[in-house]
Amino acid sequence: MELVDTPSLEVFEDVVVDRQVAGFDPSFWGDYFITNQKSQSEAWMNERAEELKNEVRSMFQNVTGILQTMNLIDTIQLLGLDYHFMEEIAKALDHLKDVDMSKYGLYEVALHFRLLRQKGFNISSDVFKKYKDKEGKFMEELKDDAKGLLSLYNAAYFGTKEETILDEAISFTKDNLTSLLKDLNPPFAKLVSLTLKTPIQRSMKRIFTRSYISIYQDEPTLNETILELAKLDFNMLQCLHQKELKKICAWWNNLNLDIMHLNFIRDRVVECYCWSMVIRHEPSCSRARLISTKLLMLITVLDDTYDSYSTLEESRLLTDAIQRWNPNEVDQLPEYLRDFFLKMLNIFQEFENELAPEEKFRILYLKEEWKIQSQSYFKECQWRDDNYVPKLEEHMRLSIISVGFVLFYCGFLSGMEEAVATKDAFEWFASFPKIIEACATIIRITNDITSMEREQKRAHVASTVDCYMKEYGTSKDVACEKLLGFVEDAWKTINEELLTETGLSREVIELSFHSAQTTEFVYKHVDAFTEPNTTMKENIFSLLVHPIPI
């Protein structure tokens, strides 16, 4: 997909340029993750975890009853342990999909629906019709069933565009759970509060797990074996993540980009790693995390260069050099970009060196997406300098690329296992399927809304909010409300696509879904990537600094 043809370019000549440099906060972390590695005895944790995993496998063999099976699966998933028990869960769900739930209550029916929808089973939402009265409203007697309401609330977020009953369920359950919250006892009240802020379907698993462990340990019906395993597993993964982050921080320091000394780039290497880690935290995705983190930091440098520093002519020169992908192009660039350009080429070569011979084709896709990314940034520079405010549709065609999700997804996929990152997977991704477009839409709009106030302080390209306001003559608040409606539609598209058979590994499809979930992590109420001393810092402390007491 080509976004703009860059014309032939003249050699850059140094001139005095008056630049509007964005003032970004410096890195909070510095060398913390290089110099402050906390030693946890991993040997005993691994040994004990294996014992506990065997005990949990026995639970799957010995569990009796539909409700007990569903609760076991749900608990394991919410505690982030499901990657250890994929076969057991798949076998149990294959049995559950054929169970007649007509004689069960709201809690059980909604849990059954959610567990199956989460794994791609297209169970009908008609199962909830029996909970409506003659007027088509949810029954009054459900209003005091907090457990059933919460179960329905979380299930309803797996709805598609045609399932209006689930839209009604969200409104009904949210209103009533909010009313009941003050009268609920902990730890259930904490769980309700947590999921009212972000439903399970949109929660980053690693972040939710950290919170849920604290809730689950106070449950009167907790399983001590599962709880101990959850704590051990969290801490063992944290040890792995700390080691990876130490490597990443050392790599970033050694890279020593000249451009960083100009102080217009967001130094967010720790935040970049955390972004990648919350998408897929399992040991099997270590290489993907390392590659995607490095790529995300390069994207940040590229984005800030176009957006916050380079002139239009300099942007054109950089874009043209990237399209040619030749180190000889460095002489055409202004001095401050030369070091970055050459190191960028070297890093892509390092990515290729990380891959086995049969995997190296992936970098061809990655380079192509990088070129497209630079074209999108350049086009935005043109819009900015021309004070051009396009119609929303035109803006979205460009900005769902410039937001960087497509490139980032390609980078993460490039580092995944051979059975997942097949040639077919890359061809599917390159076709820009509906789920990729929907994920990019969510990230684009939430990014624009949370960064809107900061962007107004300097010359900037029109955002989706600006475009909507101009096209429809609305206020900022109305524009944001309407755009968030598009976000809700995009989530429903994702849900539909997760129920569609593609012939690819489900991990390929879910990777895009997990990437969209990061909006709750990065763009919930503020642009936490640009302003990291907010929720981002809190999450990094809880996920990467503080282990869970055992």
Swiss-Prot record:
**Family annotation (CDD domains):** Terpene_cyclase_plant_C1
Q: In which tissues is it expressed?
A: Expressed only in young rhizomes. Not detected in leaves, roots and mature rhizomes.
Residues recorded as binding Mg(2+) 2, renumbered to this chain, are D303, D307
EC id = 4.2.3.55
Catalytic activity annotation: (2E,6E)-farnesyl diphosphate = (S)-beta-bisabolene + diphosphate
Report if keyword Translocase is assigned. Answer: no
Q: What does this protein do?
A: Sesquiterpene synthase involved in the biosynthesis of bisabolene.
**The protein's name in its UniProt record:** (S)-beta-bisabolene synthase
